[in-house]
Amino acid sequence: MAFVIVANLDDLEPGETLFVEELREPICLVRLDDDDVRAVHNTCTHQQQPLHEGTVQDDDTLVCASHNSRFDLTTGESVGIPVVPPLPVYACKIEGDAILVDIDQQLNDAPIPHHPYH
């Protein structure tokens, strides 16, 4: 699969998340600032909760709303406590007003988490 359009920039303000379910895996888009959007798997590796319900932090991490698992949005690594397995991070780019993701370009070697809600 190549890059596909999953959202428009207008759909996502800086500091917000957006659930994308059109791809074969559930994706959480995170807009860090005007020209930086990240794409991670939408399933927390701690208790399999949806990450788009979490909060974006100033240090470019995402905190799960359920149990406060925290993930680095660049590496997918768990930060702090509880220490949990890493989160898959996917290739994401902005072209014009479009946000594109390539689900086949995983940027780390994290295993794909089980996602019971999808």
Model-derived regions: residue spans:
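N-terminal pre-ligand scaffold of iron-sulfur
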Residues: 1-57, 89-118
